[in-house]
Amino acid sequence: MNVSQDTIYAQASEHISDFQFDNRVAGVFSDMIRRSVPGYTQIINTIGDFADRFVMPNTQIYDLGCSLGAATLSIRRQIQGRQCRIIAVDNSESMVARCQENLNAYVSDTDVDLVCGDIRDIDIQNASLVVLNFTLQFLPPEDRETLIAKIYQGLNPGGILVLSEKIRFEDAPIQTLLEEQHLDFKRANGYSELEISQKRSALENVMKPDTLITHQQRLTSQGFSHFSLWFQCFNFASMVAIK
């Protein structure tokens, strides 16, 4: 798969529109997320490992906010022969179209239902694994608990939710430190100060990170009895919750 370089914010613009997962972003998303999210490849690979451990035969897997299908592909590689179905959902037509191309490039006996729609409208049932990989942060904060409740209800006992998010910190010095470390990560991956600044402006109104404790409290309040942070690099984290 050819990966185009992300130069979306390389030219100065007087008006920065809110970030959207449109055709421009879909075309460079693989490069964008690799250069922007520390540990992304490890997260994707480990989601596959979790699938191998937790996915039961004849159950369903949900990848909510599937983007180009990286998590779905990682899962599918690990669950051959289990007669499972993956439901991969994204609300961006451009992302879904490119995701379908990526899925078509690999042969598998695991069916994938690729849905262009709102993850809040998806019926979740008979699930052994649900993935929210850098998705919840883009939902309105008031809708997040309702979605987590729906996921919990749709998971079978022993099923898991993998939740990856950018997080924020109540401790101001820690927030500043880890935010600066993340900016250094982006600089080291070739993003200019202009690109970093304009991307930040684009995301300001559409991505609202929670604290780690907010995530944990939300999950436990909806019934998850087992929770752990399993990955963190700077202000990016991935959590696992078991029903």
From Swiss-Prot:
GO biological process, one term: tRNA wobble uridine modification
Residues that, per the record, bind S-adenosyl-L-methionine: 40, 65-67, 90-91, 118-119, 133, 200
GO MF annotations, alphabetized: carboxyl- or carbamoyltransferase activity; S-adenosyl-L-methionine binding
Taxonomic superkingdom: Bacteria
Keyword line: S-adenosyl-L-methionine, Transferase
EC number: 2.1.3.-
A Pfam family: Methyltransf_25
Record flagged with keyword Transferase: yes
Alphabetized InterPro entries for the sequence: CmoA, Methyltransf_25, SAM-dependent_MTases_sf
Disulfide partners: none
PANTHER family linked to this entry: CARBOXY-S-ADENOSYL-L-METHIONINE SYNTHASE (PTHR43861:SF2), TRANS-ACONITATE 2-METHYLTRANSFERASE-RELATED (PTHR43861)
HAMAP family from the UniProt entry: Cx_SAM_synthase
Family (UniProt): Belongs to the class I-like SAM-binding methyltransferase superfamily. Cx-SAM synthase family.
Quaternary structure note: Homodimer.
Purpose of the protein: Catalyzes the conversion of S-adenosyl-L-methionine (SAM) to carboxy-S-adenosyl-L-methionine (Cx-SAM).
Protein name, per record: Carboxy-S-adenosyl-L-methionine synthase
Organism of origin: Shewanella baltica (strain OS223)
